[in-house]
Amino acid sequence: MINIRFPDGSIREFEAGVNSLDVAKSISPSLAKATVAAYIDDQLKDAKDAINSNCELRLITVKDPEGLEILRHSCAHLLAHAVKELYPSTEVTIGPVVDNGFYYDFSFKESIGEADLPTIEKKMKELAKKSAPVSYRVVPKAEAIEFFKAQGENYKVEIIDSIADEQVKIYTQDNFSDLCRGPHIPNTSVLKAFKLTKLAGAYWRGNSDNEMLTRIYGTCWATKEDLEQYLNMLEEAEKRDHRKIGKVLDLFHFQEDSPGIAFWHDNGVRIWRQVEDYMRASNNKYGCSEIRTPLIADFSLWQKSGHASKYAENMFATKSENRDFAIRPMNCPTCVQVYNTKLHSYRDLPIRMAEFGIVHRNEPSGSLHGLLRVRSFTQDDGHIFCTPEQVEEEVILMVQQCFEVYKDFGFNDFAVKIALRPENRIGDDETWDKSEQMLKNALDANNVSYELLPGEGAFYGPKIEFHLKDAIGRSWQCGTIQLDFSMPQRLGATYIDKNGEKQVPVMLHRAIVGSLERFIGMLIEHYAGNLPLWLAPVQVAVMGISNNQDDYCKEVFTMLEKNGIRAKLDLRNEKIGFKIREHTLLRVPYLVILGKNEQEQKIITIRKHSGEDLGQMSVDDFCAFLDKQIQAKE
């Protein structure tokens, strides 16, 4: 007999060789039905793995985040199974889990399009209903290579060749086998709520020199209700797509001459200025001085900073007069150069610098997505140089600033996470231990709850991430606060301590809205283009019922502009109903409609974008009304 301890502290006896499914059945049939895996002494295992010794056990169900990930990974295998049934000559490659779903890359011998997805999905449902048990075997690499080579799965052979371990796992369901670390669901009947969503192209291993594969995306959920809710959200997201709204509102455009870099139009620049001016005022409030540094620097600077060895593939390089240069992918190394121009005492610290710095990153063309994923963007970077003793207080201030900013922009629901050391990093473990603990202490001191993200920190330090939830429930990773002991040392930043000795300052990197391009894209989708008054590119449209009111329209328009209102004058010889509809589609918050009565009484009639009639008032009263709303960020 063995003893199994449960999360509530209780201990029960079981026969040696029992598995997690058996344990779940002994508690309740419904629990067994929902169980897909288990943590056995903190190791995630398949639900049918035998337990042969005393242990701590935590069952994982489809309702747990880990369970949902297993469900989605297993659904990717089901997709590959269905594709092999329908198109036997197809070679399968990889099928990972992504946000809200999964994808699988295939090398098809025949042409496949979006129209084929319903057929593949139907086959997936047929296979799932067979309730085929899912099992695995551990085999030597050589045996696995022979197994997949015999099936003509050359991509799998290449993957196995690249694995350092001497043994690998092969999972099997019915007549389909796939290479995988697992764990997976106990049987295919668990997969009930899934849908294939789209098809795209993807290069093998992300390298454009390799074959273009067909990537099929899907989503999978614990229940059909969850799936339906997600699909409804996707439908709503389609309506809010910032690329479509940006075209309607004449904000920006993209073209192939400059892939991944936006061309901003007048209306878009108006929004940009509001965001930038707001952040500039916020930085002033929190004691940041503003700097501006070069976009291009000698490649030796990037070698010193560590970017050349860790980030070179994402950097744009150029050559001039036999010197190698790089266009900056990040602002921090050039900011350190400003700090280094003066001798600093510990009494000078903290020194807070802010920069709206343009950066360029060589993102793969397939990953570009409107304003949300670009190759050139402006970052609202801040860099704070301080002593180790000042770190926690500075982080607390930055967290407060972030919370304040997000609420003013209308994001009231957000989560805080700490991204911990990645595998590819600079600096020793002792420094990383100290850095990670400092961020935890700062959040604890501010009573901020947070989630830990192992392996997701920057190569030079851990970071706090702010994830904002938008109006339709999507989560957006936005601001970051990063702790860095390494870069100031590598770039020669120092200060004189109270003993007259040179010390290296701690460097805090922070971005609150992050990429201004991406943040504006988020705002457009969050508000479905109906931006709050203070952000709207055009706040008021002024129009007359007939051309007889043109002079009065001009007079009202001029008064609004003098009061700092972003107004648009519409004197076109069109029917008033047409003008109202057009400016409503353009999401103008307020429409001023002027007729003979308004002209004679020197008043205005106001209509909200929603269609609500606000009645009549003087221009001065309307300006005061607008100003109050703008100041309140409503």
From Swiss-Prot:
Q: Which cofactors is this protein said to need?
A: Zn(2+)
Chief localisation class: cytoplasm
Sites where the protein binds Zn(2+): C332, H383, H509
The protein's matches in PROSITE patterns, at most eight in alphabetical order, are given as: AA_TRNA_LIGASE_II, TGS
The record, for InterPro entries, names: aa-tRNA-synt_IIb, aa-tRNA-synth_II, aa-tRNA-synth_II/BPL/LPL, Anticodon-bd, Anticodon-bd_dom_sf, Beta-grasp_dom_sf, TGS, TGS-like
Cross-referenced PANTHER family:
THREONINE--TRNA LIGASE, CHLOROPLASTIC_MITOCHONDRIAL 2, THREONINE-TRNA LIGASE
- Give the UniProt family note: Belongs to the class-II aminoacyl-tRNA synthetase family.
Q: What is this protein called?
A: Threonine--tRNA ligase
The UniProt gene name for this protein comes to: thrS
